[in-house]
Regions:
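Flexible, glycine-biased helix-capping/connector loops in cytosolic signal-transduction modules
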Residues: 32-33, 43
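Arg/Lys-rich, alpha-helical DNA-contact motif
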Residues: 2-12, 17-18, 36-39, 49-160
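A short, glycine- and basic residue-enriched loop/turn
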Residues: 26, 38-46
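Alpha-helical residues within the helix-turn-helix
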Residues: 17, 30-31
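Short coil turns linking two alpha-helices in DNA-binding domains
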Residues: 19-25
Length: 160
């Protein structure tokens, strides 16, 4: 039987063993908004194979790069979800995820995409946000640089 990497098939205990953490540490990651579990009807947490890499990435940020939970959350909060999941300008202006800097979009229950019924566990922003956090600076710098360059070129063309 082949399973999708997003299918919730791993118990919290199995996940903890695979990544070398305690069950309480996995719960703490979830409590801090760094990990989203799937809940069964009986309330048991299940995780996907992708969550194994997500937890390993979080461990790397904490142990090797010296981040704390708040630092990781704030870094994930600046992920440009509006570029990955384009939404209308009017929606962006009123979106708490777009305007906020302290929580990633999947922690904001009033985010526009959540209200539309999107499941954060399966969302591109959440799925790759944890894995890309080390490259956020490059992503944002490149975007800003290209935007500044385009603006500067337009300005120069208008002056001639």
């Amino acid at each position: 039987m082949i399973t999708n990497s997003l299918d919730p098939v791993i118990s919290i205990g199995t996940l903890a063993k695979k990544v070398g953490l305690s069950v309480s540490a996995i719960r703490k990651y979830e409590e801090q908004g760094l990990l989203i579990s799937h809940r069964t009807y009986s309330g048991h947490r299940l995780f996907s194979y992708e969550d194994i890499e997500r937890v390993r990435s979080i461990q790397h940020l904490i142990k090797e790069l010296g981040f704390n939970f708040e630092g990781i959350r704030r870094m994930q909060a600046i992920l440009p979800c509006w570029d990955l999941l384009p939404c209308e300008k009017k929606v962006q202006e009123n979106c708490l995820a777009y305007n906020g800097t302290s929580k990633p979009c999947w922690m904001i229950k009033e985010a526009h995409c959540t209200l539309k019924g999107n499941e954060c566990r399966k969302c591109l922003v959440y799925r790759f946000g944890s894995l890309l956090t080390e490259d956020i600076k490059d992503l944002i710098h490149k975007e800003r640089y290209e935007t500044d360059q385009r603006s500067r070129i337009k300005q120069l063309l208008n002056e001639t």
